[in-house]
Amino acid sequence: MPNQRIRIRLKAFDHKLIDQSTAEIVETAKRTGAQVSGPIPLPTRKERYTILTSPHVNKDARDQYEIRTHKRLVDIIEPTDKTVDALMRLDLAAGVDVQISLG
């Protein structure tokens, strides 16, 4: 695959899980002879929600919740056919969203 690049974006709520998945991807790509750029940490998205705990009055009684979405970016430069096959067979954790683009 001359002049190819595989860009892998990972999203997860658990930072330990996403770091483990990126380590597996990088190790697999390096083992098959491809150049790897990354993992590059992208900005973490924080979504905050405020909910009233009282059903009627007492507006001061509130709970606050936060969801953090962690993101990582891995570029595989000049992948071989063995690299693509190994990445297709790779089994990642269930809590990690993976987006792959060729370019």
Swiss-Prot record:
Belongs to the universal ribosomal protein uS10 family. GO terms for cellular component: ribonucleoprotein complex; ribosome. Keywords: Ribonucleoprotein, Ribosomal protein. InterPro entries: Ribosomal_uS10, Ribosomal_uS10_CS, Ribosomal_uS10_dom, Ribosomal_uS10_dom_sf. One of its GO terms (molecular function) is tRNA binding. GO terms for biological process: translation. This is Small ribosomal subunit protein uS10. Involved in the binding of tRNA to the ribosomes. The lineage of its organism: Bacteria, Pseudomonadati, Pseudomonadota, Gammaproteobacteria, Alteromonadales.
